[in-house]
A protein has these predicted regions:
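A ubiquitous structural signal for well-ordered alpha-helices
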Residues: 6, 51-52
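Extracellular/lumenal/periplasmic "stalk" regions immediately C-terminal to a signal peptide or transmembrane helix
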Residues: 1-18
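Periplasmic OmpA-like peptidoglycan-binding domain that tethers envelope proteins to the cell wall
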Residues: 33-51, 59, 69-158
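Short Gly/Ser/Thr- and Asp/Glu-enriched loop/turn motifs at secondary-structure junctions
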Residues: 19-23
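Short, aliphatic-rich beta-strand segments
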Residues: 24-29
Length: 158
């Protein structure tokens, strides 16, 4: 089961899948997952996360990180210290749903908050800020497989 195949029927502007240097990145816009300024996951989000869970549960050797990203607009909501806090809470909310609702093994997941420090666009317009508010699932390559590839490359180079 591939992520593109499973998520293909979702709106392209809300989900983006990229592969760079052997790492798979799945970015999901925050409007699909959360209400503004909130880390409570929406009903629509559970549908998307269920599809992601199906793929990762089919590949038990995959480990992945769930990253929360925000724009740079200061947040003033009770219970949330700042954008970094919000990004961590959003990543953790996604990880908990994957574990509790879809039985993804918690040892395979890392939750990380990135705040507004890794934008995909300048924060100069509301459209660009919306692009920066996202949750990114980073499928991590297994290091032992990575080292095997390096060793093979070294042997081939000799």
């Amino acid at each position: 089961t591939s992520l593109k195949g499973v998520l293909g029927n979702m709106s392209d502007e809300d989900i983006e899948i990229n592969v760079e240097k052997g790492v798979v990145y799945v970015s999901i816009s925050d409007k699909l997952l959360f209400r503004s300024g909130s880390y409570t996951v929406t009903t629509k989000a559970k549908e998307v996360l269920g599809k992601v869970a199906k793929v990762v549960n089919d590949k038990p050797n995959l480990e992945f990180m769930v990253e929360g990203h925000t724009d740079n607009v200061p947040i003033k909501i009770e219970g949330i210290v700042d954008n970094w806090d919000l990004s961590v809470k959003r990543a953790t909310a996604v990880v908990r749903i994957l574990e509790n609702d879809f039985d993804v093994a918690p040892a395979r997941m890392t939750a990380a908050g990135r705040s507004y420090y890794i934008p995909v666009a300048d924060n100069d317009t509301s459209a660009n800020r919306a692009k920066n508010r996202r949750t990114r699932i980073v499928v991590l390559p297994k290091l032992d497989q990575f080292y095997d590839l390096i060793e093979q490359g070294m042997k081939a180079a000799q």
